[in-house]
Amino acid sequence: MNFKHRSFFKLGILLALFIINNSCKTTSINDGFYPIFNGENLEGWSGDSTYWSVKDGVLIGEVTPEIILKRNSFIIYEKEQPSNFELKLQYRISKNGNSGVNYRSEKIKNKPFALKGYQSDIDGKNRYTGQNYEEKKRTTLAYIGEKVIIETMPDSILLTNIRKNVKRNCWQTRNITASLGNKKELTTHIKDNDWNTMHIIINESRMQHYVNGILMSDVTDLDAKNRMIKGYIGVQVHTGPPMKVEYKNIRLKIIS
């Protein structure tokens, strides 16, 4: 191969690498996800500034001995109430922390910054992280490692008294259809006091919670009396001991 041909060959390789590199970047940019937290302030969100702040691109929820919570408090994304979507974020939580990511949730009247609805649970000891817990409503729908179908609530139970269908903080009209794995093994994939990635996929009646790429719970909600088909997204600080939870890179993708 002469010098001229070698030059064209090298140029061809460089051009191919450039195209591949830019193709990867385009895929990343056009993956359908967009940020809903700007990393600078609380624009688009509402919450109690006693507990929520922004620093270095991170949304921080903190409870100190001086400002102990009397009830759970959320910071709520106000700009939209999505129905079918994917939500990706990174979180870090202290050992005694208790938090969660709510979605398809509704505001509770006369209680500022309170939500009721589906939640992908998060706690520092990883007893509940990734399970599906319905805040202020049907309680636990699926524990870690469960694939569950929620059946319609019996007609004998009134909507005003759904707690009648709850035992030991767990909804009773549910069928475990498969195991996603052993809870102890699944939670080994969660890093303590470090950044983890949560990916929530909500499509029609199905809700899947992933942590660091591992499916922790999978719920299909067929309970037309109680299920929500759209609602607010929010993240929580929980009653209990002093705690700190941090969120960053919160991104949403609408599923059409």
Where are these regions (language model features)?
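Bacterial Sec-dependent N-terminal signal peptides
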Residues: M1-I29
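Carbohydrate-interacting regions of secretory-pathway proteins
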Residues: C24-S256
